[in-house]
């Protein structure tokens, strides 16, 4: 198909859309929104949504699932066609699959970033709340983005590149020629899955080899460790050497500078240094120092980094909002042209009424647990902040891509504004903390899914899809993914929850009689029945959390959650597995700091100024801050993946576009998915102790083998070599196939 000539200046000035010829012409109507496409898309969305949630809980970030989902759709349909003789899938069916399948990753980010903060504040993570927030936020983001499609996708085609959406369109067009790319994804998935099972279930080598630095007087609490994880290795390759280097720099500062410095200067203290309440610094290990002091420094740095990234994008944010509102007032917004197939959006009446119905449901279902006035105010803030940040997110993903979209910064802004409004209204009671978090969670999920929806609609615009079909597909994908992601979050938290009776984790005072009079009961590890005592943030009775107390109120056990928990060692002496994403802790700090005023502000401010210094030095403050918050063991394997990508890119002299579509990127996507799914299954294994004991081969190995660093380093090195070999053996072919020409027209 011959590309049309560029539009004239007059046409451009008149606001007419640029001349564009998609891959599938408007006059053709191939199969698109079919049952098989929607079913496959929802299944892949569930798989990648669950794996994205696991990844987020590990490192506080996710990676786009659109490209691997598109590749898998092409190959699976091709295989089914050959095996059972079903009709070959059209490119538009494949596009529906990737559209429905992409919702899981964006919802996973929003849910993982916000919902665990409930437990840090001292509340239970109610399953119904998690499900409703996930579903309502996901659908709201889609509906609010639909009126912006013509403004951002059509009228600004050629101005807003939408990098991931354009790359996915190239994958779909290239998929008409073969399926070798999918084999690369499946290979990475299989390698990572087997590796994770051998390491975590069979315990053939250590999951986290570590070395305590010794030999320097006074420098005795610095630990170099790495998590031998295929998931983190894949993440490092995808985000690249620059970002991976910045993250590991933050990890080095925290583990090899801040922790040893605090230990050195605090070794002479004879009283606890706040926020510690009982332990002396000289008696703390590296993990305790991190949890007591460095965690708040990291939270302050993450908050400042998120705000900085949002401020840097402020001109784009203002332009996005003004442009979106202007376009909706003109012929590009509410008056949708229904004459052509590729212009058919979901009816605007459905969008408006659906958005209002969702907000009404939020106010009516008790998601905002306040009085009637508080619910109405909260629903209004969701509507206002939701549309604001969905507009911002949709525009920014077009400008800088999903990976650089500052969703965390938008959520911080929402939470700050919400808490300040509550504070000015005098709403500082216990219920308003949950209300503030619920508002921020819905806005976070909506803005995240709004950005993903815009990328999907860009892909559809390039390949010639029907927008309405895509919009229904991603709504179905959002609902199914949200339900599974909610269950996955609860599963991962519950199976890694620990019950401890160690005195250092228990309150020194008894629970008030009125606090446990009507409390539910639970059975403790000793078989006795106890009352459940929830201690919320702001209480001076005990650290926030869940406790089991006897009838007199005396604490007997602490129920420590699997996400952002504080217990490091189980009762049997084994290491407790915990997820420590930075965002939930940060959001809890913001709510606690504004509504209760009780916060170690000195440490938070130190972290904020640290982020400012890093930004002034020309380095991404947010990536560095995440590195400060996460353990060095998490950022080191990410750094190794980044080093491998840097070497491969230099060896092949690839452009950024070629590198982003290379075989090693697809292999890394497989590593992430395979390692994450295996990790989720390892969590399920905790439910059946007999299965856990059966798979454990460490008793048959030499004494101490599974704890030695050597076997883990060798195994992880071999895994890294498979990634290096994949990157070196072939240059990408995708970028050259089905390319988008200078006018943005798809060459067919």
Labelled PLM ranges:
Residues 1-748:
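Alpha-helical multipass membrane-protein architecture
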């Amino acid at each position: 198909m011959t590309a049309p000539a560029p539009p004239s200046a007059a046409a451009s000035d008149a606001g007419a859309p640029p001349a564009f010829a998609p891959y599938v012409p408007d006059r053709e109507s191939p199969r698109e929104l079919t049952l098989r496409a929607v079913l496959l898309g929802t299944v892949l969305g569930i798989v990648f949504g669950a794996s994205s949630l696991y990844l987020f809980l590990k490192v506080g970030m996710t990676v786009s699932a659109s490209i691997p989902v598109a590749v898998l759709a092409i190959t699976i349909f091709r295989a089914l066609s050959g095996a059972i003789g079903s009709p070959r899938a059209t490119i538009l069916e494949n596009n529906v699959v990737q559209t429905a399948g992409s919702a899981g990753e964006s919802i996973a980010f929003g849910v993982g970033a916000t919902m665990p903060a409930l437990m840090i504040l001292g509340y239970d993570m109610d399953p119904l709340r998690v499900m409703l927030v996930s579903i309502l936020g996901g659908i709201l983001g889609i509906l609010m983005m639909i009126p912006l499609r013509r403004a951002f996708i059509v009228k600004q085609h050629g101005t807003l590149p939408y990098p991931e959406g354009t790359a996915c369109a190239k994958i779909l067009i290239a998929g008409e020629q073969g399926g070798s790319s999918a084999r690369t994804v499946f290979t990475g998935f299989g390698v990572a899955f087997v590796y994770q099972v051998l390491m975590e279930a069979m315990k053939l080598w250590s999951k986290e080899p570590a070395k305590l630095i010794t030999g320097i007087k006074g420098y005795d609490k610095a630990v170099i460790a790495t998590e031998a994880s295929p998931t983190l290795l894949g993440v490092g390759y995808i985000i690249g050497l620059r970002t991976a280097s910045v993250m590991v720099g933050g990890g080095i500062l925290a583990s090899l500078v801040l922790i040893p410095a605090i230990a050195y200067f605090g070794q002479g203290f004879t009283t606890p240094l706040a926020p510690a309440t009982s332990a002396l610094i000289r008696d703390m290990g590296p993990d305790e120092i991190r949890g007591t002091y460095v965690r708040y420094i990291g939270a302050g740095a993450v908050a400042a980094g998120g705000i900085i990234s949002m401020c840097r994008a402020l001109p784009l944010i203002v332009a996005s909002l003004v442009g979106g509102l202007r376009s909706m007032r003109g012929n590009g917004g509410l008056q949708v042209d229904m004459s052509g197939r590729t212009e058919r959006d979901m009816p605007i009446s459905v969008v408006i009424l659906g958005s209002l119905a969702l907000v009404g449901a939020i106010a009516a279902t008790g998601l905002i647990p306040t009085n009637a006035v508080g619910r109405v105010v909260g629903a209004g803030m969701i509507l206002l902040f939701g549309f604001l940040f969905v507009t911002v997110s949709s525009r920014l993903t077009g400008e800088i891509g999903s990976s650089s979209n500052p969703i965390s910064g938008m959520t911080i802004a929402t939470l700050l504004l919400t808490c300040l409004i509550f504070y000015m209204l005098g709403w500082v009671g216990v219920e308003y903390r949950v209300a503030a978090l619920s508002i921020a969670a819905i806005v976070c999920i909506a803005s995240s899914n709004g950005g993903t929806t815009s990328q999907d609609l860009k892909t559809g615009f390039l390949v010639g899809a029907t927008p309405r079909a895509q919009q229904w597909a991603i709504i179905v994908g959002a609902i199914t993914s949200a339900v599974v992601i909610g269950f996955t979050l609860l599963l991962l938290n519950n199976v890694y929850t620990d019950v401890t009776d160690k005195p250092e984790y228990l309150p020194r005072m008894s629970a008030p009689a009125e606090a446990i009079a009507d409390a539910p009961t639970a059975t403790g590890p000793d078989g006795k029945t106890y009352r459940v005592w929830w201690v919320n943030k702001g209480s001076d009775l005990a650290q926030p959390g869940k406790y089991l107390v006897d009838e007199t109120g005396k604490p007997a056990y602490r129920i420590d959650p699997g996400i952002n928990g504080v217990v490091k060692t189980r009762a049997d002496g084994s290491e407790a597995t915990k997820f420590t994403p930075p965002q939930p802790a940060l959001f809890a700090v913001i709510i606690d700091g504004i509504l209760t005023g009780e916060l170690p502000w000195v440490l938070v401010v130190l972290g904020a100024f640290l982020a400012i210094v890093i930004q002034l030095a020309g380095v991404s403050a947010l990536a560095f801050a995440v590195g400060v918050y996460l353990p060095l063991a998490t950022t080191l394997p990410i750094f190794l993946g980044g080093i491998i990508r840097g070497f491969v890119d230099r060896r092949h002299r690839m452009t950024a576009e070629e590198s982003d579509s290379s075989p090693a990127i697809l292999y890394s996507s497989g590593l992430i998915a395979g390692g994450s799914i295996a990790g989720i299954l390892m969590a399920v294994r905790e439910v059946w102790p007999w299965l856990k004991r059966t798979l454990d081969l460490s008793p048959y190995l030499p004494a101490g083998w599974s704890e030695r660093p050597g076997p883990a380093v060798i195994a992880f090195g071999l895994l890294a070599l498979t990634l290096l070999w994949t990157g070196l053996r072939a240059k990408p072919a995708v970028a050259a196939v089905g390319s988008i020409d200078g006018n943005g027209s798809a060459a067919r």
